[in-house]
Amino acid sequence: MKSEDVKLGIERAPHRSLLRALGLNTESFQKPFIGIVNSFTEVVPGHIHLRQISEAVKEGINAAGGVGFEFNTIAVCDGIAMNHAGMKYSLPSREIIANTVEIMAMAHAFDGLVFIPNCDKVVPGMLMAACRLNIPSIFVSGGPMLAGRLRKNDQVSCVDLNSVFEAVGQVAKGQMTEEELLELEKVACPGCGSCAGMFTANTMNCLTEALGMALPGNGTIPAVDSRRTQLAKSAGQQIMQLIKDNICPKDIITPDAIHNAFSLDVALGGSTNSVLHVMAVAHEAGADFSLEQINRISDCTPNLCKLRPSGPYHIENLDQSGGIGSVLKELKPWLKNDARTVSGKTIGQLADAAPKADNKVIRFASNPYSPKGGLAVLFGNLAPNGSVVKRSAVAPEMMVHRGPARIFDSEELATKAIMGGKIKTGDVLVIRYEGPKGGPGMREMLTPTSLLAGMGLDKEVALITDGRFSGATRGAAMGHVSPEAAACGPIAALQDGDMINIDIHNYKLSVELSDEEIQKRLANVPVFEPKIKSGYLKFYTENVTSASTGAVFKD
């Protein structure tokens, strides 16, 4: 056992003395040491209840003959960090999470790890750490929040955080009163858990099942459901079996597992952020995978779910309809069914054991919403290295669009123009210098897209950015444009009025300019000057790579 480095031999007497100070006895030193990587915090609704999850994990570890040690890492709430300087720190927190877990696991010689994430950057940060450390590991998330219930005119409707973001646009356009907004604000987020739709956090927790790193139910069992606590206890027990069998993350997260994750992703219509994060996980796992492969998967994999923001359903509905297992069951013809999972069974075996889909929340593969998946990576002279769009959330009339560019060099400038009613039907908003380096931190453009949707412009206006979008974004929103403006990508050459062509059906994103004109303009673009010159974001700006490679650090 790896933990023998801190507990066996005469020279480890000082180490054992310190461990005895924790309450361990001689018998404890014969057992595997398990690190419980918690991300509890009192400022994130998705993480406020994770102490309960951790206690259940400890029970499972103890019952199976191990010794559990809980430690924490950080967690950022993207909703609270949205639309101010805090959003610059959200994506960069992913690398901090991976690094802190690496430090704690190596310093204390754990034999295995149980990861307890829930929200956006915590899941991929922990997955990256698991691959980097490559010791037996298992994930159990905190689970999704229930949808809120809003009573209006004797009718009750389901609402969520995205409802509030879009309502701000309705208020700005005079379609909702501030009093009505307040009533919505009070009920949209009814308690603990990751925000209730197929937003980034829930996308990543669902994909963790398809990657093989979590037990069935991880992605969909609600945070307040007792099955969530039972799942946590089972994860604590299962880590002991993984240690016994010496099954490590790189045995599980292979190119086949990445294929399965993206197959599930496009079937669900998951968040565009998943592309960024799964590519980063693949990088840490040494699993070679390209953006072009995502399009090949999406071309042949049906879109089976319309979950918020793409449709009316929430994660609790997905769970009631069979959960991720039922989706995988429909996807079996497109999966790498022999891929391993932490359950000890293959992904195909788990799919076989799942209940049949209901053909409502989870459609049959023979009756999909679309024969093609919900995500697409667009290429062209505006995005030579790719740009990501959630096509399942794009209105049919915007799948092909041609319009004049409206250039904004920050999210704030674009938001001001939208709120001021200065955006016209047909416009293509371009928000640049918001990429990994340029932002820095690749902020989410949820406020601009929510305002457009709330004002009813999501079927008339497109938005392109080298920044990111929230999983709650809907509309013709193309993000992750690579290379970014700060790296002198073609997006930096755009001027107001340039005609932009979007063809999601054929994976194209281009500007009606010759290559010579683009290069001529780029030659006159000033050298990018970092916006932040101290602290962690200075380090981040100097070391982060392109969104097309997952925005990981330079090797």
UniProtKB/Swiss-Prot annotation:
GO BP of this protein: isoleucine biosynthetic process; L-valine biosynthetic process
Pathway given in the UniProt record: Amino-acid biosynthesis; L-isoleucine biosynthesis; L-isoleucine from 2-oxobutanoate: step 3/4; Amino-acid biosynthesis; L-valine biosynthesis; L-valine from pyruvate: step 3/4
InterPro entries in alphabetical order: Dihydro-acid_dehy_C, DihydroxyA_deHydtase, DiOHA_6PGluconate_deHydtase_CS, ILV_EDD_C, ILV_EDD_N, IlvD/EDD_N
Keyword Magnesium: yes
Any single Gene Ontology cellular-component annotation: cytosol
The UniProt record lists the keyword DNA-binding: no
GO molecular function, a single term: dihydroxy-acid dehydratase activity
First-level EC class: lyase
Protein residues bound to Mg(2+): 78, 120-121, 444
Pfam hit, one: ILVD_EDD_N
Cofactor note: Binds 1 [2Fe-2S] cluster per subunit. This cluster acts as a Lewis acid cofactor.
Keywords: 2Fe-2S, Amino-acid biosynthesis, Branched-chain amino acid biosynthesis, Iron, Iron-sulfur, Lyase, Magnesium, Metal-binding
Signal peptide feature range: none
EC annotation from Swiss-Prot or TrEMBL: 4.2.1.9
N6-carboxylysine PTM positions: 121
Cofactor(s) named in the record: [2Fe-2S] cluster; Mg(2+)
Reaction equations catalysed: (2R)-2,3-dihydroxy-3-methylbutanoate = 3-methyl-2-oxobutanoate + H2O; (2R,3R)-2,3-dihydroxy-3-methylpentanoate = (S)-3-methyl-2-oxopentanoate + H2O
Family: Belongs to the IlvD/Edd family.
Function according to Swiss-Prot or TrEMBL: Functions in the biosynthesis of branched-chain amino acids. Catalyzes the dehydration of (2R,3R)-2,3-dihydroxy-3-methylpentanoate (2,3-dihydroxy-3-methylvalerate) into 2-oxo-3-methylpentanoate (2-oxo-3-methylvalerate) and of (2R)-2,3-dihydroxy-3-methylbutanoate (2,3-dihydroxyisovalerate) into 2-oxo-3-methylbutanoate (2-oxoisovalerate), the penultimate precursor to L-isoleucine and L-valine, respectively.
Protein name: Dihydroxy-acid dehydratase
Organism of origin: Dehalococcoides mccartyi (strain ATCC BAA-2100 / JCM 16839 / KCTC 5957 / BAV1)
